[in-house]
């Protein structure tokens, strides 16, 4: 078996587990940093090891374009290529169909939030006229991408996705799926779900048996479609299950989707909530039974000047547990970013110094900020695991979220 999952502790719907693969193991629930192009900007593998990062996620679509999955295979696979001795997860490339297509056109993500939904839904009817402008177009066969750098057309199909992920040599791979928009109506979501299910069957036929294949539950905000998809995936021999977007119009919609889906998935297999990683979500979704998360947010927010802080430093749901280091208040602030954090940044540098680096656009800022944010989330997940094991999760959640 390319993957073994052992549940060590449970608390209500939560579990602490251990995933074992051919390139090592990791504890769950886990936050997985995203190394899109086989790298996390500003960090090297020694940094990841120092943080305790045991698993990363790389992007199939982007690595296929550059440097090319066949080249990576020639060089011994991703582990050797990037000299990483931990577990590597690759996505299927399906999310790019959304982010480079409808998502790019309308500027929305997996959760719609405060946008003019009905007005934008009407635009779906005019999509055919605008397809030439998009970088990605979905068909029943797969997805056609326009490489934004070279302009060449690339077609990604379920079989091709499995081939690329095999060449990359990752440990955990995902079935090719269509991630619909929060703006998609029921008719489109249902058709997309039928495609996702057909593509999942194709992936089961063509994937590399040395890898652990996860199926992806889709269905948008519609309960019956989500439940249909969860049952479909649960009946197939996947090593684990991803829960994909769209995740509705609000955080509550996302939690409702987890309530519908998770009870229908096999208890003995891991569940991965794709593309989610906000501090609030790590608590609330773990409470629903999620085991794995991946998200670019910690690194992306770091580059934009937002650094994570704990409740002891004023972090809360309203400020999303972040301070913006460019604020003038930090100009003469000799405190570390977070006095409760023992990362190398908080042990050695002040807020004033980090603000100076950020304002001066110094490269060192990006390394230090990214290090702090990823370390912060990785260590928070350690605390969450410990709290599930010793029964103190709800106290920890109350300390952080206030409820």
Curated annotation (Swiss-Prot):
Transmembrane segments: none annotated. It is an enzyme of class 2 (transferase). The active site is at 91 (proton acceptor), 294 (nucleophile). Binds 1 zinc ion per subunit. Residues 275-281, 299-303 are annotated as: RNA binding. Keywords: Glycosyltransferase, Metal-binding, Transferase, tRNA processing, Zinc. Zn(2+) binds at residues 341, 343, 346, 372. GO terms for cellular component: cytosol. It comes from the Archaea. It catalyses: 7-aminomethyl-7-carbaguanine + guanosine(34) in tRNA = 7-aminomethyl-7-carbaguanosine(34) in tRNA + guanine. Its EC number is 2.4.2.29. GO terms for molecular function: metal ion binding; tRNA-guanosine(34) queuine transglycosylase activity. Substrate binds at residues 91-95, 177, 218, 245. The keyword tRNA processing applies. PANTHER family: QUEUINE TRNA-RIBOSYLTRANSFERASE. Catalyzes the base-exchange of a guanine (G) residue with the queuine precursor 7-aminomethyl-7-deazaguanine (PreQ1) at position 34 (anticodon wobble position) in tRNAs with GU(N) anticodons (tRNA-Asp, -Asn, -His and -Tyr). Catalysis occurs through a double-displacement mechanism. The nucleophile active site attacks the C1' of nucleotide 34 to detach the guanine base from the RNA, forming a covalent enzyme-RNA intermediate. The proton acceptor active site deprotonates the incoming PreQ1, allowing a nucleophilic attack on the C1' of the ribose to form the product. HAMAP family: Q_tRNA_Tgt. Belongs to the queuine tRNA-ribosyltransferase family. NCBIfam families: Q_tRNA_tgt, tgt_general. Homodimer. Within each dimer, one monomer is responsible for RNA recognition and catalysis, while the other monomer binds to the replacement base PreQ1. This is Putative queuine tRNA-ribosyltransferase. It comes from Archaeoglobus fulgidus (strain ATCC 49558 / DSM 4304 / JCM 9628 / NBRC 100126 / VC-16). The lineage of its organism: Archaea, Methanobacteriati, Methanobacteriota, Archaeoglobi, Archaeoglobales. The gene is tgt.
């Amino acid at each position: 078996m390319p993957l073994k999952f052992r549940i060590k502790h449970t608390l209500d719907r939560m579990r602490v587990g251990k995933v074992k693969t051919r390139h090592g193991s990791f504890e769950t629930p886990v936050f997985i940093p995203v190394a899109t192009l086989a790298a996390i900007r500003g960090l090297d593998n020694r940094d990841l090891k120092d943080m305790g990062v045991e698993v990363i996620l790389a992007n199939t679509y982007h690595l296929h374009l550059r440097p090319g999955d066949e080249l990576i295979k020639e060089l011994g696979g991703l582990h050797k290529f990037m000299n990483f001795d931990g577990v590597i997860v690759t996505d299927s490339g399906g999310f790019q169909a959304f982010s480079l297509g409808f998502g790019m056109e309308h500027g929305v993500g997996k959760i719609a939030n405060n946008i003019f939904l009905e007005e934008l839904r009407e635009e779906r009817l005019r999509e055919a006229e605008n397809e030439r402008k998009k970088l990605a177009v979905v068909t029943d066969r797969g997805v056609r991408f326009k490489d934004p750098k070279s302009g060449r057309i690339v077609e990604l199909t379920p079989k091709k996705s499995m081939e690329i992920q095999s060449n990359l040599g990752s440990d955990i791979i995902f079935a090719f799926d269509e991630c619909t928009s929060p703006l998609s109506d029921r008719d489109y979501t249902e058709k997309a779900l039928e495609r996702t299910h057909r593509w999942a069957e194709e992936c089961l036929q063509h994937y590399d048996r040395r890898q652990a294949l996860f199926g992806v539950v889709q269905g948008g905000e519609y309960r019956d479609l989500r439940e249909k998809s969860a049952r479909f995936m649960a009946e197939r021999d996947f090593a684990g299950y991803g829960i994909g977007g769209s995740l509705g119009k609000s955080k509550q919609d996302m939690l409702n989707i987890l309530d519908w889906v998770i009870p229908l998935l096999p208890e003995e297999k891991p569940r991965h909530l794709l593309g989610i990683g906000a501090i609030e979500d790590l608590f609330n979704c773990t409470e629903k039974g999620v085991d794995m998360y991946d998200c670019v947010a910690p690194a992306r927010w770091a580059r934009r000047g937002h650094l994570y802080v704990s409740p002891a430093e004023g972090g809360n749901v309203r400020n999303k547990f972040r301070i913006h280091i460019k604020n003038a208040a930090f100009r003469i602030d000799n405190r570390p970013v977070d006095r409760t954090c023992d990362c190398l940044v908080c042990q050695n540098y002040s807020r004033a110094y980090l603000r100076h680096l950020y304002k001066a656009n110094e490269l060192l800022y990006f390394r230090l900020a990214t290090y702090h944010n990823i370390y912060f989330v990785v260590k928070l997940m350690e605390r969450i695991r410990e709290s599930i094991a010793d029964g103190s999760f709800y106290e920890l959640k109350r300390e952080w979220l206030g409820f």
